[in-house]
Amino acid sequence: MRPWPIILAACVACSSATALAREQAIDVPAGTVPESAIAMARQTGTSIVVSDPVLTKRRTPRIHGRMSAPQAIRRLAESAGARAVATGTASWRIEPRPRPRRAASVRRSKPPDPGRGAVQPPPPSAVPPTPIVVVASKRDTSLEDLAAQISLIDGEDLALGGMGGTEKITQRVATVSSTYLGSGRNKLFIRGIADSSFTGPTQATVGQYLGDMRLSYNAPDPDLRLSDLERVEVLEGPQGTLYGAGSLGGIIRLVPNAPELDSQFMRGTLGNALTQHGAASVDANAIANVSLVPGKAALRMVLDAASEGGYIDKPLLDRDDVNRTRTLAGRAIMHAAIAPDWTLDVIGLAQSIHAADSQYAARKGPDYDSLARVREGADADYLHGQFVVSGRIGALYMRSTTGAAKQEVQERYDATMPGDEDRVFVQLNDTRMIAHETRIWVPIEDRRFGWLAGLSLVDNSARLNRRLEQGRKRSSATGAHNSLTEGTIYGEASYRLRDGLIATLGARYTRARLGGAAEDVSLALAVAGTAITETRDQSAFLPSGSLVAKLARGTSIYVRYQEGFRPGGLAIEGEFVRRFRQDHARTLEIGARHGRAGIDPFDLAVNVAYTRWSDIQADFIDNLGLPSTDNIGDGRVWTFSASGSVFLTDDLRLSGGATINRSTIDEPTRFFSHRISHVPNIAEFSGRMGLDYSRSVGRDLDLDARAWASYIGKSRLGVGPELGDLQGDYVDSGMLVRIGNERIGGTLSVTNLAGTKGNRFALGTPFAVLREQVTPLRPRTIRLGVDFSF
């Protein structure tokens, strides 16, 4: 046997190893693990494989500096909470660490097992903690550099126990609250910034986003299914500089999982539930990823379907469990690498919700009985599409998003007057929006200076039509059509004053043209058409400033000033249409945070905020019993919030959160001077606690258990004595157990463990405010489910 081939191979291997060990300039932008691995492989001349679906949706920060290829790959793996395994001289595999749910705990107690040729990571002192990149910052800011109160919910946590909507967010974040008219019809509030109980011409106080595009402008929460998400980010407000109008309370951003360019898989869940004093429920979910062009393009699709059994009875109609709700939703994302460092995403989403009847009951009647003599209910349909181009040129990043949304909500309310024939009030809210945003930025990361500049355009049209149905009679009630065209430029710049101290200044200028007209007006008003049609221009300048200081690794404090606004519009009162003014919020806050939730042994975030809210827009009940809108005065809101968690053992984590709100309307308008004293719909105190337990129970089985309880304090329904009923003051609870592995698992969950009736919302129909209505919690529900992947 000749030795030359062996000697030649050894020389090549030594040469390759020497080249890999040589330090070189590395600059890999922030992105998902597969995106970062591709960029890393190009720059280091190595082969890097990321095949585990658990890792493909994780995000990594920018990796920048001079280092060898092995050092760079180890750093990439560490930032993803994974490990690098050398499979050859210049080839690597990035895989999850054993028992990833307890990775932080294991690292605290002992070094990881290097088995199967794993490359040992550098000592802890040489590798900084994995930074968490906040997508909602719009410029890839790490959590420790962000001067804001933010809550992050992992998508895998949301997926446990079957599909769900916004209620899964309110259960996990104490500062987020909601009305409870029904799925697809609710209003959301953050940080005690609440205006009213109804959805009318006023813009929402919370901005909701799917990726970079807003879900709606002045429509209710569409209650999208939270399936196949990387995570949800709740950024407390105001967020006027970055997000503009309609972010007084903050924003909720849904970050979907990106398609995986080199993977083919399908996952799904099936579930069946039984509700005490109610009908059975069923739900199903399917997720599919298809690689269209390996390494270049992929398609990811999600389908959700559910039928939730009712639990409200209407004895006057001799019907039980009337409020069954059916939901059908689908989402598709096509992701393509169109050039080095440039990608294209096309996203489409559709959802339809049908509520067969209302979900409120009589306060003093049997537990779940409604005294309505008519069939109510609602339909909520939502369509959404967006087109996203993103990339980078050197250190400069760019992202451009264009899209459209359509939301249609039809509601039926019992409008029967005492001693009169049965009557139904029907309201149709049809909203259409076209939006565009382009921004460029240089992330601060380890630089001295970072900045962001952007522009956005919004065109929104909202048509509100109403009618009364009494027997075969149909009579139209006055409606309104509001339109808005808005142009905005904004910017933000951060400067590192010294190591661990970053100052940020920002501003946004918005110019909007508002239009409005009455719909279905009476003949007398139609003759005077100039009195019911109006167009005007408004502008707003929203400055912001913040300072964040790192006291130690993982510990920082910050102070921030921010503003927000909502444009005015036209409101209906009786048979007349009138104008209401824009409102404006100014907030000063101070906060501190330590650690990374669910990763570090201990984490804590606290925040105190003071808000001055001028010309508050709110809804009230007019003389005809219909919802109307007006400016109710000026107010002040104090908010204190805290959240944290601690690992009691390697397997057991305790978490909790609480919020305290104090509000006053200190300069009410003349009409409301004797009717209001504080902001409605916000409890003075709310809090939650949870326990998470995870461990291996066999060679290929993991056990995950969750238990939680939350308390929602008392709040007032709305503005005026007609809406003065109290609500809240109840405890909700639940638990979930899953046993299985990544391929298949079974779940058992129970909601409303204590069987609490409670009162989530003291209104079901605005025409029967004297009936003392309540909206009870769904009775105790037990669900069995199975999830699978192949």
Residue ranges, per PLM feature:
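C-terminal beta-signal and adjacent terminal beta-strands/loops
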Residues: 710-718, 738-790
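A beta-strand signature from Gram-negative outer-membrane beta-barrel systems
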Residues: 215, 226-269, 789
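Membrane-embedded beta-barrel scaffold of Gram-negative outer-membrane proteins
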Residues: 132, 285, 388-393, 397-416, ...
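N-terminal periplasmic accessory domains that precede
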Residues: 92, 166-169, 188-189, 209, ...
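Gram-negative outer-membrane beta-barrel transporters
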Residues: 503, 511-512, 605, 609-612, ...
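Transmembrane beta-barrel wall of Gram-negative outer-membrane proteins
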Residues: 267, 276-355, 381-383, 432, ...
